[in-house]
């Protein structure tokens, strides 16, 4: 998720410096389903995510990336981003360029009049899932693809148990568990898998978990399908592209939630 502020609190700088030098673990893929679009079994696929400015598909491809995560959420009041929600035209341009597309959702954010989405509990999850499903379909997203819902802050286990897990259960009630994914730190990803509130990838041993390096203290959740290795936050400027800065994500499984994978 690319709409960043200095999110980590007083220890933000120290944690970023540790993470900056953490070594990434190579991952081997095993193909898990039949593809109807670009191949997804290579070892080094990378995706970008961004919100502030829409990056043309040809620039993503020219920079050597394999796809993008796109927002199926409305633009919150006061924000001036031009990439929420994703349009059918833009999604089609990505696919025409041979790029993978993955859906994600974030509306609220800490420090804004619209609070973090998960704070609204079960009923908020129901409402968010309905919006996400509508915008995903409008952009051409298939019925089999998951949507990753963001927990874009450093929550603890008590917060997870008291409100965040119920938010995801509300999402489950609309999308079904099998299409529900989550974005968050390593512990959020682990809790979501363990509590059964996100679905499994068709790649064995992986679930719809998109881990960010932020707040993860260098730890990796091995069951995730995506890892956000470069994050635009504070002094970390991300990857320059298309007149904006983007986050970079490593693909960890053959089925990482891409639209072009046939899961039937």
Task: Annotate each language-model stretch with its function.
Residues 177-191:
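Aromatic-lined carbohydrate-recognition surfaces of secreted/lumenal glycan-active proteins
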Residues 46, 50-55, 70-156:
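Substrate-binding cleft of extracellular glycoside hydrolase catalytic domains
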Residues 61, 95, 172, 176:
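Anion (oxyanion) recognition and catalysis
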Residues 44-53, 57-60, 189, 194-264:
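Functionally critical loop-and-helix segments that line ligand-binding/catalytic clefts
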């Amino acid at each position: 998720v690319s709409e960043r502020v200095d999110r980590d609190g007083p220890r933000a700088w120290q944690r970023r410096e540790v993470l900056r030098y953490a070594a990434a673990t190579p991952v081997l893929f095993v193909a898990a389903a039949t593809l109807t679009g670009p191949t997804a079994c290579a070892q080094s696929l990378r995706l970008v995510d961004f919100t502030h400015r829409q990056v043309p598909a040809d620039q993503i491809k020219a920079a050597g990336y394999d796809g993008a995560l796109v927002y199926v959420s409305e633009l919150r009041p006061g924000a001036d981003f031009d990439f929420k929600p994703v349009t059918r035209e833009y999604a089609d341009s990505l696919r025409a360029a041979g790029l993978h597309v993955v859906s994600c959702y974030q509306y609220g954010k800490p420090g804004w009049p619209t609070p973090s989405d998960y704070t609204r509990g079960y009923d908020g999850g129901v409402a968010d899932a309905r919006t996400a499903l509508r915008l995903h379909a409008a952009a051409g997203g298939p019925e089999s693809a998951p949507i990753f819902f963001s927990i874009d802050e450093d929550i603890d286990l008590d917060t997870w148990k008291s409100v965040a897990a119920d938010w995801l259960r509300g999402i489950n009630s609309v999308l079904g568990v099998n299409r529900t994914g989550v974005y968050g730190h390593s512990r959020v990803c682990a809790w979501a898998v363990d509590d059964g509130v996100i679905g499994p990838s068709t790649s064995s041993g992986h679930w719809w978990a998109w881990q960010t390096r932020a707040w993860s203290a260098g730890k990796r959740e091995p069951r995730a399908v995506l890892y956000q290795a470069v994050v635009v936050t504070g002094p970390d400027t991300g990857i320059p592209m298309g007149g904006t800065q983007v986050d970079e994500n490593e693909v960890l499984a053959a089925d990482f939630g891409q639209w072009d994978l046939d899961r039937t």
